[in-house]
Amino acid sequence: MEHQRKLFQQRGYSEDLLPKTQSQRTWKTFNYFTLWMGSVHNVPNYVMVGGFFILGLSTFSIMLAIILSAFFIAAVMVLNGAAGSKYGVPFAMILRASYGVRGALFPGLLRGGIAAIMWFGLQCYAGSLACLILIGKIWPGFLTLGGDFTLLGLSLPGLITFLIFWLVNVGIGFGGGKVLNKFTAILNPCIYIVFGGMAIWAISLVGIGPIFDYIPSGIQKAENGGFLFLVVINAVVAVWAAPAVSASDFTQNAHSFREQALGQTLGLVVAYILFAVAGVCIIAGASIHYGADTWNVLDIVQRWDSLFASFFAVLVILMTTISTNATGNIIPAGYQIAAIAPTKLTYKNGVLIASIISLLICPWKLMENQDSIYLFLDIIGGMLGPVIGVMMAHYFVVMRGQINLDELYTAPGDYKYYDNGFNLTAFSVTLVAVILSLGGKFIHFMEPLSRVSWFVGVIVAFAAYALLKKRTTAEKTGEQKTIG
């Protein structure tokens, strides 16, 4: 391994993109157990639970679907992170095995460039609104600072809270996995306290019976419950399309495959059991108690009389947003941007570039057209499902779990593998799978497929790539060789 690292350094690759040595792979089971809790318990996910009630499913069906989703998510995170934990290599480099050295740039930029940066900016803005609530609870006069002053549509209090929250997120991004790990270790028990406490509060207010009987006003019980049950699972799993693609950005730090597999599985299942119970109890209980459908946990917290309880709950919600932003957005963006010019850019350069772009896009302006921006991001997310299918089929079926690192860390300008650095089979399969999974958003008769788009994209891409891809002497990327 040390000989390989020196060779790759001579080719110009930065330390951040090199394979991790065994001594650098320090993450154990507990590190992975705590990693994703904040990504499960955040404001958009709780709002999503409210959307599930609109489908007309029972409370029990929604809870069961959410819990089952955890097993699908864990399986994909573990399997697509297997190469990372075996070779200590980040996603940006692993992607080269299946799409080619040059071809990897397109799906990589979709994930680490466009989607990650836009979501980073949007999450920073959403978090700044919670931050505004937090400061306003303590210092009401803060909300009127600056009078009518605005900058690019933001009031002075809004601008201050956005910049504060943005800087905190950027700081976590610069710290990378080490800082994130310490942060999530603190966050986890706080999540149990806040969301577990909110669930108990809701049950104590209205009782468990009414919660299980809850149906939003004007909604009829679903007739095609079986398909809608699958739609709920797809919706929960699809949220993880981007993190699952870049799972190797975190599994590269794993001490072993077993530890990342056990840690991620236990962490996600436990997190989603709590989320399933807390989500339906909080949303249904609050809606019954306040006499109106209330699906945003921030709206619920603002109604509380206790200043301390409100302050602590909003603080933890802010922390979950930071955790989600780090694991899902800024860290993958940092690695992917560094991979665009591996001889010139480092991970921290990538974080800085992504952070600045997230400011320049003015996310508060994007939120003025929420439907359009979320449709755009949903389409990008839908493209990543097929990428997962191709990556897993290539690694497990075509290459049988073996990667030739020398062919991933080629010298600049060396595109001898695949067709001038592009795996055309991977791109063809991805295109077909994307059309099948997202076509329903534009073509009416395909609409049922789009409601389970993640499953369609992953399964079609995996099966098609595994069947079409043949190992030839011309295309051997991923074969294990001895490097002299």
From Swiss-Prot:
Catalysed reactions, semicolon-separated: (S)-allantoin(in) + H(+)(in) = (S)-allantoin(out) + H(+)(out)
Main location (coarse class): membrane
GO terms classed as biological process: allantoin transport; nucleobase transport; purine nucleobase metabolic process
Topology term for the membrane: Multi-pass membrane protein
Transmembrane regions listed in the UniProt entry: 35-55, 59-79, 114-134, 156-176, 191-211, 225-245, 266-286, 307-327, 347-367, 373-393, 426-446, 448-468
Spans within the Cytoplasmic topological domain: 1-34, 80-113, 177-190, 246-265, 328-346, 394-425, 469-484
Keywords on record: Cell inner membrane, Cell membrane, Membrane, Purine metabolism, Symport, Transmembrane, Transmembrane helix, Transport
Protein's name according to its UniProt entry: Putative allantoin permease
Organism: Escherichia coli (strain K12)
